[in-house]
């Protein structure tokens, strides 16, 4: 895993946790939780790829890993749409920059997960 990606996740999560979006703070907390979950999932896939041949172990641990992979892609798509929406409605430049960086990170992570999953298939 790229150390820049790790610091990007940490930076964006820290920035998002500092935002005060009024009534939508509950939604923002949900986004933060999903970002953290996505990071952990991406990391676990990356570790499995690093141990090449770990597909059988991955399948034994979680017989529904393809279903889980599909669910993660749905979460990524939802997060991308949510971040795009927030980017459109916010007028605060700090929030705009944070959401633009979050969007870029989501797109990068989506590509990484696709790459990892193809290597495991």
Curated annotation (Swiss-Prot):
Places the protein is found: Virion; Host nucleus
Annotated family: Belongs to the influenza viruses NEP family.
Keywords: Host nucleus, Host-virus interaction, Transport, Virion
GO-annotated cellular components: host cell nucleus; virion component
Residue ranges annotated as motif Nuclear export signal: 12-21, 85-94
One record GO biological process: exit of virus from host cell nucleus through nuclear pore
Stated name of the protein: Nuclear export protein
Quaternary structure note: Interacts with protein M1. May interact with host nucleoporin RAB/HRB and exportin XPO1/CRM1.
Protein function: Mediates the nuclear export of encapsidated genomic RNAs (ribonucleoproteins, RNPs). Acts as an adapter between viral RNPs complexes and the nuclear export machinery of the cell. Possesses no intrinsic RNA-binding activity, but includes a C-terminal M1-binding domain. This domain is believed to allow recognition of RNPs bound to the protein M1.
